[in-house]
């Protein structure tokens, strides 16, 4: 039985898979809903992904899977906090699927499922992401559905 910490969050978003993919991968979008953080990469497997906040690199990770516009996975290792530096990278995966469980009259709907896993048992990062992901994903959803993100600061 696997007892490692794992975070799973699903939400429905009134958008298309392509628009959601763009929001996850375009720094012009990520800075709007991720507290000013730009995610920069060419989004190819094995490539570097850099998280930049206020001009500083706060993550330097690797793309593990990239299947536009359906699946994105990368390593996750925060660099901005001393207490996290000794912890090995974890893994975050974004699965995007068209949702057909409700009427399509309002337009396309996708289901986004974020899975964040591969944490050590005594992870200091895990409790932080459990608080952070709901904020980020709620802001992403709001941006895609209304055109304006929820503003917050780290």
Regions found by a protein language model. Give the residues of each.
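Glycine-rich portal/gate segments that line the openings of hydrophobic small-molecule binding cavities
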Residues: 41-80
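Hydrophobic ligand-binding cavity/cleft-lining segments
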Residues: 1-40
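Hydrophobic pocket/interface hotspot
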Residues: 20-21, 30, 49, 63, ...
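Short solvent-exposed loop/turn micro-motifs enriched in small/polar/acidic residues
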Residues: 4, 33-34, 42-44, 56, ...
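Generic structural detector for well-ordered beta-strands
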Residues: 8-14, 50-52, 62, 95
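Beta-strand/loop substructures that line and gate deep hydrophobic ligand-binding cavities in soluble
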Residues: 81-134, 140, 151-154
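Amphipathic, soluble alpha-helical interaction motifs
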Residues: 33, 139, 143-146
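Intrinsic-disorder/low-complexity, polar/charged segments enriched in Ser/Thr/Lys/Arg/Asp/Glu/Gln
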Residues: 4-10, 48, 58, 71, ...
